[in-house]
């Protein structure tokens, strides 16, 4: 097991064997923990993701999956096997600005659309969420995101937090007032909008 969430300069980075992960799961149960989040980077790039999720579920834990939506088939496999109880999927930006937001010249949106369809038409509880970055997100973007997500889904705006481990330096967060205005824009199409991180 390896955490892809931290930057290369993050402290204490190491890979764990499945035996070490099992010990952690046992210790967590002894501490009264009843749920785990499988996160990353993108955890579905891990070829052992199904096995790890099954181990967690077999030990009686609830499982949340954090995903960017780029692997709809793998996500569907976990859902069909009842290995996840909740999915949080990132919506990086409006479709027109996805490539720019993820740092690519071109980006294939079809896996994102497919993951959204699977969640919206599926049996697992889920949320969509956007980490809001001052340099990347505007009111116009949230007009487009609201129209794109239109429906009763849960949608969260998360304020960006800078740190020494963020790969791209110089990014900033929006003010509380601006985040609230973005939430109001999205609520015209998605009533269930909340803000995190303020």
Task: Identify the function of each model-found stretch.
Residues 1-18:
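Canonical Radical SAM [4Fe-4S] cluster-binding loop centered on the CxxxCxxC motif
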Residues 25-35, 44-176:
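Conserved AdoMet/S-adenosylmethionine-binding subsite of the radical SAM
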Residues 41:
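Short, charge-patterned binding micro-sites
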Residues 180-198:
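A C-terminal junction/extension of Radical SAM enzymes
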């Amino acid at each position: 097991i390896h955490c892809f969430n931290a930057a290369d300069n993050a402290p204490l980075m190491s890979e764990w064997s499945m035996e070490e992960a099992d010990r952690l799961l046992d210790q967590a149960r002894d501490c009264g923990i009843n749920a785990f989040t499988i996160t990353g980077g993108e955890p579905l790039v891990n070829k052992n993701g199904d096995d790890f999720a099954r181990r967690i579920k077999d030990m009686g834990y609830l499982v949340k999956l954090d995903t960017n939506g780029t692997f709809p088939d793998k996500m569907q496999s976990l859902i069909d096997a009842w290995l996840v109880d909740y999915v949080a999927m990132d919506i990086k930006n409006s479709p027109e600005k996805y490539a720019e937001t993820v740092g690519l010249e071109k980006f294939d949106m079809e896996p994102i659309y497919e993951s959204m369809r699977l969640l919206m038409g599926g049996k697992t509880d889920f949320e969509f969420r956007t980490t809001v970055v001052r340099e990347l997100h505007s009111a116009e973007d949230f007009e487009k995101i609201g129209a794109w997500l239109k429906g009763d889904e849960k949608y969260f705006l998360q304020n960006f937090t800078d740190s020494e481990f963020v790969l791209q330096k110089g990014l900033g967060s929006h003010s509380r007032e601006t985040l609230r205005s973005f939430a109001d824009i999205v609520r015209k199409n998605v009533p269930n909008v909340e803000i995190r991180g303020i």
